[in-house]
Amino acid sequence: MAGKKNNNNGQYIILRTPEQQVEIDQRNARRAQMGRMKKARQPVQRYLQQHGLRNGLSGRGGYIVAPTSGGVVTRPIVPKFSNRGDSTIVRNTEILNNQILAALGAFNTTNSALIAAAPSWLASIADLYSKYRWLSCEIIYIPKCPTTTSGSIAMAFTYDRNDAAPTARAQLSQSYKAINFPPYAGYDGAAYLNSNQGAGSAIAVQLDVTKLDKPWYPTISSAGFGALSVLDQNQFCPASLVVASDGGPATATPAGDLFIKYVIEFIEPINPTMNV
């Protein structure tokens, strides 16, 4: 029974029933949670008050205002190597390929298999090991077209090499974590290439490494991979980058570069002459 009781020191002790104590604990937990949420929102609210809204984030969409002019300067970083037990971990950022807007607004699509041999610098490292896995893999779009360039681009990962190529940008836009953007967007990505901070308003897609089919994939050369059937390619390739564009200008225009920022782990060294 709830009430008060006098202890040996002459102080009153409040007695509560178990039901009352549970209710009080729940109320205190709700108050603490609301306090944490309010505190977590303060930096965001303060930033918006000072700077206003920025270009939309890749992770949740937003808006882009075409700049009157723009340019990007990129510098390569020194690749970083580390070891964990018997494995070798490599961190680097490099150009994967570029995206072209087809002439007269025609639809255009590209498909890049994300095997360890896909990035040109990493390919020579992959030859030295039997197996690999992506610990982190992001594709960052850096524009290089005029800011008046028309068109739209969609970018997404697919997880089955047997999937048919999209025939319209709308099809690719329905893929898991797909992103749509104008070709002139993404200047902020230059600062993200060599940074460990959040992507901010960079145009980027992140590979969900927690949902891949296998824990490890065999390494293979690009030539050997290309000679396989699409079903066999799934044994070596965890995912593919698919990019689609339409609505471009009258003449074919290079829209931008696609950089790959990765952390990859290799195991089981092998002589490269044997690893085909």
From Swiss-Prot:
Residues 1-85 are annotated as: R domain, interaction with RNA. Pfam families: Viral_coat. It comes from the Viruses. GO terms for molecular function: RNA binding; structural molecule activity. Keywords: Capsid protein, RNA-binding, T=3 icosahedral capsid protein, Virion. Residues 86-266 are annotated as: S domain, virion shell. Capsid protein self-assembles to form an icosahedral capsid with a T=3 symmetry, about 28 nm in diameter, and consisting of 180 capsid proteins. This is Capsid protein. It comes from Tobacco necrosis virus (strain A) (TNV-A).
